[in-house]
């Protein structure tokens, strides 16, 4: 469909909770396709509608071998007490990385493009990406959850040791 322009990190849409999708129609299908096209053009792992200036609870995550995960009005149903601290970043904040502690396992309820309710259990990296993107749709950047922001030198070392 179309590669959309990303809003800058200072855009007010990124600080507000996105609106729930109420109508499951062709405009939602176009939005999901635009998110996919833009995500791949930006070489990102995930993207949500507010990042392309649409205040809707719609996101897409590239789960690599498992394919694309489309999230519409996602809600966390439960999450494990067991956590993992790992590096996070965002295309909205290029060159900014932080260590964020998140649940190791989550159960999320969402809807598919046709309005059917789906529930999925996600672990580790996928759980982290879902939690990150839901935060983003709720106006919470990963930097607010970060235990600490890393220096350029620390980020370099992190990728070398990974």
From Swiss-Prot:
One of its GO terms (molecular function) is peptide deformylase activity. GO terms for biological process: co-translational protein modification; translation. Gene3D superfamilies: Peptide deformylase. InterPro entries: Peptide_deformylase (IPR023635), Peptide_deformylase_sf (IPR036821). Pfam families: Pep_deformylase. It comes from the Bacteria. Belongs to the polypeptide deformylase family. This is Peptide deformylase-like. It comes from Staphylococcus aureus (strain Mu50 / ATCC 700699).
């Amino acid at each position: 469909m179309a590669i959309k322009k990303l809003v800058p990190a200072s855009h007010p849409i990124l600080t507000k909770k996105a609106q729930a999708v109420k109508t499951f129609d062709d405009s939602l299908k176009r939005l999901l396709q635009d998110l996919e096209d833009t995500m791949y053009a930006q070489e990102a792992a995930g993207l949500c509608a507010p990042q392309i200036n649409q205040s809707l609870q719609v996101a897409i995550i590239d789960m690599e071998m498992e394919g694309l995960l489309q999230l519409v009005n996602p809600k966390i149903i439960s999450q494990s007490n067991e956590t993992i601290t790992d590096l996070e970043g965002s295309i909205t904040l290029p060159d900014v990385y932080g260590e964020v502690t998140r649940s190791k396992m989550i159960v999320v309820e969402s809807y598919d493009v046709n309005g059917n309710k789906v529930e999925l259990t996600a672990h580790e990296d996928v759980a982290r990406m879902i939690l990150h993107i839901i935060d983003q749709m709720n106006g919470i950047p990963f930097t607010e959850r970060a235990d600490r922001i890393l220096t350029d030198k620390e980020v370099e070392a992190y990728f070398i040791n990974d």
